[in-house]
């Protein structure tokens, strides 16, 4: 039986309206109170702003990601008291203050192995031997570090980095020397510790000087003209790269107790710039009585000039997928070493009547044995004070090199130069590090070209700068040499030469010699407190770590014999 409208109205509760009761029994100091938790979600009872056709067929996770409540009370991701918006809320969003820790898509590189043995450096003789620079076969070179890796599908410029992507070992590389099982690990030093070392040293003083230098040809400072590019010509001159303990001058200075630590500028700069290094290397340290000699092995990685060592996407080896044999690290290092050797010989004016002679003749050149004339090279043996306040004097003697001399345009005085060359292989190839086209940009955008080289070759340029400062050179000349054809590494052209004061260039690179002196003194002290013998300082091939090993008697003889044997095999071929 249907009820009448009057009966329904009569059944309604008494009061002014309908709904929940106005009063509540829960009060706090007379104020109505509703218990709550900050963890409770305060969402909307119903959302009428979205359409009914929601693309949500991804299961529970898809639903929670797309349609969960916008705010958790007390979470701090939005305003504490959210006032209702009078306008449409669909276009409103809150910027998240939570750091995004999502990993990137791309990987970190591949495996790197060393190439075949080749003819590269100075063979060990009684006086050290001279460098035989050959362009034939690829040299054995322990290198190939990629600080970035490659994009699988991004192509050129497609690199992206994730959280702590910089801190991962990029490639599995071979060490520059085989660590034997009977070698004792004495110290392990992280690069972070090396970067905190500091020791102020003096400007140094000249102990003795040998050799001679020719005058620099200033015509190379002029920008090259496209129609008249200067070719890099191979010039055979007798150049030497004698290790420390085989240097007859250093042997005499050691007998006179001139210093405690002895080294060459190449070895010393490698140690002082160790925190910037990426490729593996090793230094042999000989401790005899109260003296320490920093030496290098024959055909060591220190003899080679690296290319784009610090580039984000460094050159790849064949084992890493590189099909460009002339752009692999070992081939590029051999090419760069060849360029530097010939570039220094070409940019000087060989005039016997105008050369600048040092106090003594070249200590390594023997006219009866050599068929080529000696290269323009002056050897200065300089002494530095590495003492601290709470001990006796500790001196270091280093053999430095100067390549040329020029007249100061203002006062006409002689300025000594160190001459080096940067080389461009192919700015569009893998491993170029985003380098600009030197032919079109070197004149108009010189600063950008140099800045890119500072980024891609930070370690190499730092070593050259340190060598110039150690030699007390007035100017560091950097040549820019490019391939005549990017697909061939046989012919090169000189595009220009730029000169800097070494200390100004060091400031641009944020290079501090006090840190380098601290590293040298620390490593020397580690060896001075130990027994006489041989030690090897090894740069880890995959980590930013230096390791100091104690080598038993005869432990390095086998390594040196193997190197000489390989050299003889190459000569026979």
Curated annotation (Swiss-Prot):
Top-level taxon of the source organism: Eukaryota
Matches recorded under InterPro entries: eIF3d
GO MF, one example: translation initiation factor activity
Compositional bias (Acidic residues): 556-573
Disulfide bond annotation, renumbered to this chain: none
Region (Disordered): 111-162, 552-573
Cellular component aspect of the GO annotation: cytosol; eukaryotic 43S preinitiation complex; eukaryotic 48S preinitiation complex; eukaryotic translation initiation factor 3 complex, eIF3e; eukaryotic translation initiation factor 3 complex, eIF3m
The record's note on its domains: The RNA gate region regulates mRNA cap recognition to prevent promiscuous mRNA-binding before assembly of eif3d into the full eukaryotic translation initiation factor 3 (eIF-3) complex.
Summary of the function given for this chain in its UniProt record: mRNA cap-binding component of the eukaryotic translation initiation factor 3 (eIF-3) complex, which is involved in protein synthesis of a specialized repertoire of mRNAs and, together with other initiation factors, stimulates binding of mRNA and methionyl-tRNAi to the 40S ribosome. The eIF-3 complex specifically targets and initiates translation of a subset of mRNAs involved in cell proliferation. In the eIF-3 complex, eif3d specifically recognizes and binds the 7-methylguanosine cap of a subset of mRNAs.
Protein family membership: Belongs to the eIF-3 subunit D family.
Protein name as it appears in the record: Eukaryotic translation initiation factor 3 subunit D
């Amino acid at each position: 039986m249907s009820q009448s409208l009057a009966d329904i109205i009569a059944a309604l509760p008494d009061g002014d309206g309908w709904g929940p009761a106005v009063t509540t029994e829960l009060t706090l100091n007379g104020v109505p109170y509703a218990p709550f938790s900050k963890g409770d979600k305060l969402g909307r009872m119903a959302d009428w702003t979205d359409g009914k056709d929601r693309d949500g067929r991804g299961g529970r996770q898809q639903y929670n990601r797309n349609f969960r409540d916008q705010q958790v009370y007390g979470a701090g991701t939005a305003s504490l008291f959210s006032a209702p918006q009078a306008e449409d809320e669909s276009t409103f969003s809150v910027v998240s203050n939570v750091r995004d820790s999502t990993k990137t898509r791309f990987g970190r590189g591949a495996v790197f192995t060393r190439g075949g043995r080749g003819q590269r450096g100075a063979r060990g003789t009684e006086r050290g031997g001279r460098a035989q620079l050959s362009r034939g076969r690829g040299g054995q070179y322990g290198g190939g570090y990629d600080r970035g890796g490659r994009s699988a599908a991004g192509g050129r410029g497609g690199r992206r980095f994730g959280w702590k992507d910089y801190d991962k070992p990029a490639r599995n590389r071979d060490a520059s020397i085989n660590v034997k099982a009977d070698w004792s690990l004495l110290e392990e030093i992280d690069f972070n510790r090396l970067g905190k070392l500091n020791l102020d040293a003096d400007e140094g003083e000249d102990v003795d000087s040998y050799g001679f230098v020719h005058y620099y040809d200033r015509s190379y400072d002029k920008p090259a003209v496209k129609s008249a590019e200067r070719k890099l010509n191979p010039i055979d001159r007798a150049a030497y790269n004698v290790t420390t303990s085989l240097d007859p001058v250093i042997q005499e200075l050691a007998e006179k107790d001139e210093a405690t630590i002895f080294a060459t500028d190449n070895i010393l700069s490698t140690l002082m710039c160790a925190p910037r290094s990426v490729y593996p290397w090793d230094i042999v340290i000989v401790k005899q009585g109260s003296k320490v000699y920093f030496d290098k092995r024959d055909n060591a990685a220190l003899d080679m000039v690296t290319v784009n060592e610090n580039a984000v996407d460094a050159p790849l080896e064949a084992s890493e997928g590189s099909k460009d044999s002339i752009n692999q690290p070992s081939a590029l290092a051999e090419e760069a070493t060849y360029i530097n050797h010939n570039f220094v010989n070409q940019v000087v004016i060989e005039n016997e009547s105008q050369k600048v002679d040092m106090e003594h003749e070249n200590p390594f050149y023997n006219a009866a044995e050599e068929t080529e004339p000696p290269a323009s090279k002056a050897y200065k043996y300089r002494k530095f004070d590495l003492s601290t306040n709470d001990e006796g004097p500790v001196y270091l003697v280093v053999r430095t090199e100067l390549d040329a001399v020029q007249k100061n345009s203002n006062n006409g005085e002689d300025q000594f130069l160190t001459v080096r060359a940067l080389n461009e292989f192919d700015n569009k190839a893998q491993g170029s590090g985003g380098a600009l086209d030197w032919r079109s940009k070197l004149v108009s955008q010189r600063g950008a070209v140099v800045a890119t080289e500072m980024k891609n070759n930070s370690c190499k340029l730092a070593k050259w700068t340190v060598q110039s400062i150690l030699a007390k050179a007035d100017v560091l000349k950097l040549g820019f040499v490019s391939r005549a054809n990017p697909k061939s590494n046989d012919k090169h052209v000189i595009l220009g030469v730029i000169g800097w004061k070494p200390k100004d260039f060091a400031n641009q690179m944020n290079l501090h010699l006090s840190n380098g002196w601290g590293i040298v003194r620390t490593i020397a002290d580690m060896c001075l407190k130990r027994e006489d013998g041989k030690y090897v300082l090894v740069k880890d091939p995959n980590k930013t770590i230096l390791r100091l090993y104690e080598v038993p008697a005869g432990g390095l003889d086998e390594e040196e014999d193997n190197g000489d044997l390989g050299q003889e095999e190459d000569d026979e071929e």
